[in-house]
Curated annotation (Swiss-Prot):
It comes from Pleurotus ostreatus. The gene is POH3. The keyword Glycoprotein applies. Aerial growth, conidiation, and dispersal of filamentous fungi in the environment rely upon a capability of their secreting small amphipathic proteins called hydrophobins (HPBs) with low sequence identity. Class I can self-assemble into an outermost layer of rodlet bundles on aerial cell surfaces, conferring cellular hydrophobicity that supports fungal growth, development and dispersal; whereas Class II form highly ordered films at water-air interfaces through intermolecular interactions but contribute nothing to the rodlet structure. SMART domains: HYDRO. Transmembrane segments: none annotated. Expressionn is switched off in the fruiting bodies but abundantly expressed in the vegetative mycelium of both monokaryon and dikaryon. This is Class I hydrophobin POH3.
């Protein structure tokens, strides 16, 4: 009698284990609530001489900037729709964009697009 109980227990336990839900951890969505997501080929400090030279050639006065400066950027509108991809640095920028050549007030966002 006990052998049947033990046999049924060992038969049912794997089925219960297989039916147990597996918790999924989805990566957090990128947070860029204060600006816009940009895909920049390069992200530099505002004090970098290359940034100052490029800004000077374009006639842009940078002034005091918080964050970093994105160079050669394009906006990312909707993630996952229409083949949006960024093979460079994804940043969240809350400053001015000068035709995508220079975008000020950027901070890196760790997402994979």
């Amino acid at each position: 009698m006990f052998s049947r109980v033990i046999f049924c227990t060992f038969l049912i336990l794997p089925l219960l284990a297989a039916a147990t839900a597996i918790p999924r951890t989805n990566p957090p969505a990128p947070t860029c609530t204060t600006g816009s997501l940009q895909c920049c080929n390069s992200v530099q400090a505002a004090s970098n001489p290359v940034v100052g030279l490029l800004a000077g050639l374009l006639g842009i006065v940078l002034g005091p900037i918080t964050g970093q400066v994105g160079l050669t950027c394009s906006p990312i509108t909707v993630i996952g729709v229409g083949g949006t991809s960024c093979s460079a640095q994804t940043v969240c920028c809350n400053g001015n964009s000068f035709n995508g050549l220079i975008v000020v007030g950027c901070s890196p966002v760790n997402i994979s697009l």
